């Protein structure tokens, strides 16, 4: 509950001032953002005057309780206010409104009227043949009817035929019998004193004059159109001298259709007016709105949410509804022009029953300071083919449609930076200025190694490109194990070499605004970030496994928190900015330097405590540690700079640069300022790349709990069975001096699918692990990890050997126990021994 009610407000108080008054408490706590107060509503009457109470919604429940504790009993001007937790409509403690009470009373009254009307109709629906049967039983009544109306004597002999030819209201006596109650006795011979026999003798005679027609009721057999209108006496047409006889005759003329009997006219006007009331069909019992909503939700499993925050995200609703069941989709409607939320959302459950439970529990409840209004939503429109339609398609088409339908649930967790091998080779060949056929010699056994090295080179360039543009590649390794992904980020893979950035933009722009598009110069992979989630979701659904040129696009959703900064420069799609030259970068360095940074710091100053290290990549191999320090000394907080080197195998007295190094600063803020200023700067003709290193300090540590030493031995898994020791040696020897390479084999001389590679230095093993990550050899992705390093401690080695011997002894003992329970039995001897007693 994060919504409070404020009572006793001044009648002149406005919502803006009330919001500002309650925002003061959040400002005192250092959280003065207006987003923390989600809703302010002063309740007013029909005339627009304040009813002196209001509702205030908070984003968090903790802020709501703090506001109650702080503001309850306080004053706004001279009015003492009362602050308490608001109740939702679903709270049983809330009294029933008068409107709801009136609705229930009207419903009960309508049900009572329908019941009385049904009983009355049931009594009035007595069959016509029942009246005829009573007349046929009473001979005196039959004689009376025949005497008064000789023309109906023949019809009286056949009551059923007479009932079919003559309407029920043709005889006043029959009408009296027809309208009588079932439980009352009707005397057939008792007539009213005002009635006489003349009414029956003149039943089928025409009226004698127009005056009598106006005063008396029309005869039963006369047509209603022939009867004078009620206002005939008022218009005075008969006495008007200006009206000719012909006009008066035309006014009195009636029309009789062919085959229509004049006597079979409808009932009199008064009776016709009463018939609609008697034939009124009662309304059916209306199903309550609650039951109708639950029925629809159980059919669709989809909910429509209203009155939500405009900055509410899909994650907020996933956390709210996921406890009730597994969710299939959460969609917040977004305006495609502005990118802002429209204030409503849809939630789709896999099980409709879970959706019904969520509707019962959460409808009209308080969420983020607002009353959440939930309605049943229509079923989502899908264009999927059913199983019957799929069976009529070719098998290849069936697989293609099924793969495209399940694309959103599939993940390439085995390699996020997957690249088309043909595109990789084409990129390397174009970079070297040769044909692809010249790069790979089909007659050479080392072609697979060359292809793997080419892929490693391209992957290295792609990593450098992404890291320079704020892509956190560590998230790609984390999200293999975690299912959380960002729906706005799409990884585009497997497109042909030569695809340009403009072609990808043209393909993805129709679905919505693109916030960022990253495509390395190698042109083997791309990352697209949409502004809105619905746009990215639509592009992913429509373009997954779509044929693009001569290849098929592979799309994958990117990990959460993939980007460490906002897009800028050439990352934006609106217009690629020209890359800044070195001089401009140097100017930006001077802007971020402190005033005292030009004064060289004393190198002899001792640094106490941990420092922050910056990892520098893509250094020129001729750049030394002194030259690197000269570039970064002007920055405040500089400690030391070092270029990593390795021994020269040709000359043991010399060392070779490894192309990267580390720079240490006193604080993280100083290191961040240096990265913002120098990332992408040019040193000795190389554009360097900077990022925070996980290694926090290069100072020696005397602590026993220091990090375990990195091993120089690597175990290579998922190795192709066709790969030989020579292939493994050629692949890894490019990254350092190898000490040993071992490919274990089975008893039949076939490979076991893994190998051990040991480098001379642990740093070389680390470099190989970094460069060969995600590389394929003979179509298989190599999986590498450090092998367990042998301990230099003699006692530890002795304990390991002791444990190994104990394990072997236990295995031997268990084998002996199993064998002791087995012995050879001669069944023939046993049978003979059993028969000796007989």
From Swiss-Prot:
Chief location of this protein within or outside the cell: nucleus
Family the UniProt entry places it in: Belongs to the RRM MRD1 family.
Function noted in UniProt: Involved in pre-rRNA processing.
Stretches assigned to the RRM domain: 2-88, 301-379, 488-560, 612-695, 712-789
Subcellular location: Nucleus
Ranges where the record places region Disordered: 195-219, 225-244, 260-290, 813-838
UniProt keyword annotation of Repeat present: yes
UniProtKB keywords: Nucleus, Repeat, Ribonucleoprotein, RNA-binding, rRNA processing
SUPFAM superfamilies linked: RNA-binding domain, RBD (SSF54928)
Classification via PANTHER family: OS02G0815200 PROTEIN, RRM DOMAIN-CONTAINING PROTEIN
Biased composition (Acidic residues): 272-289, 828-838
Protein name: Multiple RNA-binding domain-containing protein 1
Organism: Eremothecium gossypii (strain ATCC 10895 / CBS 109.51 / FGSC 9923 / NRRL Y-1056) (Yeast)
A biological process term (GO) from this entry: endonucleolytic cleavage in 5'-ETS of tricistronic rRNA transcript (SSU-rRNA, 5.8S rRNA, LSU-rRNA)
Any one Pfam family match given in the protein's UniProt record, by short name: RRM_1
Molecular function, one GO term: rRNA primary transcript binding
Gene Ontology annotations for the cellular component aspect, listed alphabetically: 90S preribosome; nuclear speck; nucleolus; small-subunit processome
């Amino acid at each position: 509950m994060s919504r409070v009610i404020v009572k006793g407000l001044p009648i002149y108080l406005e919502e803006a001032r009330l919001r500002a008054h309650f925002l003061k408490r959040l400002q005192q706590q250092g959280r003065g953002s207006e987003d923390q107060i989600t809703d302010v509503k002063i309740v007013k009457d029909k005339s627009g005057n304040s009813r002196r109470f209001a509702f205030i919604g908070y984003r968090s429940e903790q802020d709501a309780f703090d506001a109650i504790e702080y503001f309850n009993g306080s004053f706004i001007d001279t009015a003492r206010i009362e602050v308490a937790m608001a109740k939702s409509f679903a709270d049983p403690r809330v009294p029933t409104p008068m409107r709801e009470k009136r609705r229930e009373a009207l419903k009960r009254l309508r049900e009572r009227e329908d019941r009385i009307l049904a009983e009355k109709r049931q009594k009035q629906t007595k069959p016509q043949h029942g009246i005829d049967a009573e007349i046929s039983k009473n001979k005196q009544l039959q004689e009376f009817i025949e005497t008064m109306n000789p023309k109906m004597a023949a019809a009286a002999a056949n009551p059923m035929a007479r009932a079919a030819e003559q309407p029920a209201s043709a005889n006043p006596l029959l009408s009296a019998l027809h309208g009588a109650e079932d439980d009352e006795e009707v005397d057939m011979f008792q007539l009213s004193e005002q009635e006489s026999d003349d009414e029956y003798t003149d039943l089928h005679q025409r009226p004698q004059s127009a005056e009598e027609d106006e005063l008396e009721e029309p005869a039963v057999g006369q047509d209603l159109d022939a009867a004078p209108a009620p206002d005939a006496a008022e218009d005075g047409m008969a006495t008007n001298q200006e009206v000719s006889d012909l006009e008066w005759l035309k006014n009195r003329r009636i029309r009789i259709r062919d085959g229509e009997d004049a006597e079979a006219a409808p009932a009199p006007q008064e009776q016709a007016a009463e018939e609609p009331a008697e034939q009124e069909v009662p309304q059916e019992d209306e199903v309550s709105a609650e039951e109708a909503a639950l029925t629809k939700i159980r059919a669709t499993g989809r909910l429509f949410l209203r009155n939500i925050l405009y900055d509410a995200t899909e994650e907020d609703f996933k956390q709210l509804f996921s406890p009730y069941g597994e969710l299939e989709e959460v969609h917040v409607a977004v305006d495609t022009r502005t990118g802002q939320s429209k204030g409503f959302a849809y939630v789709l459950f896999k099980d409709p029953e879970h959706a019904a439970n969520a509707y019962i529990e959460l409808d009209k409840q308080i969420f983020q300071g607002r009353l959440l209004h939930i309605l049943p939503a229509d079923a989502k429109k899908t264009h999927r083919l059913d199983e019957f339609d799929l069976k009529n398609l070719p098998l290849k088409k069936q697989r293609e449609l099924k793969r495209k339908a399940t694309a959103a649930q599939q993940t390439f967790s085995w390699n996020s930076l997957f690249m088309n091998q043909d595109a990789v080779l084409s990129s390397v060949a174009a970079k070297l200025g040769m044909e692809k056929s010249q790069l790979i010699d089909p007659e050479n056994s080392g072609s697979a190694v060359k292809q793997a090295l080419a892929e490693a080179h391209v992957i290295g360039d792609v990593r450098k490109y992404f890291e320079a543009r704020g892509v956190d590649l560590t998230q790609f390794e984390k999200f293999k194990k975690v299912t959380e992904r960002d729906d706005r980020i799409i990884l585009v893979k497997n497109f042909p070499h030569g695809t340009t950035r403009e072609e990808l933009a043209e393909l993805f722009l129709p679905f919505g605004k693109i916030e960022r598009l990253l495509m390395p110069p190698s042109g083997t992979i791309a990352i697209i970030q949409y502004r809105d989630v619905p746009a990215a979701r639509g592009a992913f659904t429509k373009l997954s496994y779509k044929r693009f040129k001569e290849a098929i696009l592979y799309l994958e959703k990117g990990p959460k928190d993939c980007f460490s900064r906002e897009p800028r420069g050439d990352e934006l799609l609106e217009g690629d900015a020209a890359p800044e030259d070195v001089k401009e970068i140097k100017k930006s360095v001077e802007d971020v330097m402190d005033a005292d940074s030009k004064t060289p710091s004393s190198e002899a100053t001792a640094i106490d405590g941990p420092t922050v290290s910056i990892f520098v990549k893509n250094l020129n191999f001729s750049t030394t540690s002194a030259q690197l320090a000269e570039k970064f000394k002007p920055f405040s907080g500089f400690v030391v700079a070092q270029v990593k080197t390795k021994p020269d195998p040709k000359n043991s007295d010399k060392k070779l640069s490894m192309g990267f190094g580390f720079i240490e600063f006193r604080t993280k803020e100083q290191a961040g300022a240096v990265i913002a200023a120098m990332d992408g700067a040019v040193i000795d003709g190389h554009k360097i790349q900077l990022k925070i290193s996980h290694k926090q300090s290069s100072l020696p540590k005397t602590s026993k709990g220091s990090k375990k030493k990195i091993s120089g031995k690597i175990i290579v898994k998922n190795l192709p069975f066709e790969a030989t020791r020579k292939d493994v040696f050629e692949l890894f020897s490019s990254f350092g001096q190898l000490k040993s390479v071992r490919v274990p084999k089975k008893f039949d001389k076939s490979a076991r699918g893994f190998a051990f590679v040991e480098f001379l230095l642990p740093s070389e093993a680390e470099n190989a692990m970094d460069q060969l990550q995600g590389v394929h050899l003979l179509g298989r992705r190599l999986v590498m990890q450090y092998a367990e390093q042998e301990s230099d401690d003699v006692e530890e080695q002795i304990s390991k050997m002791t444990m190994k011997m104990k394990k072997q002894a236990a295995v031997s003992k268990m084998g002996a126990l199993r064998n002791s329970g087995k012995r050879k039995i001669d069944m023939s001897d046993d049978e003979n021994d059993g028969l000796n007693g007989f």
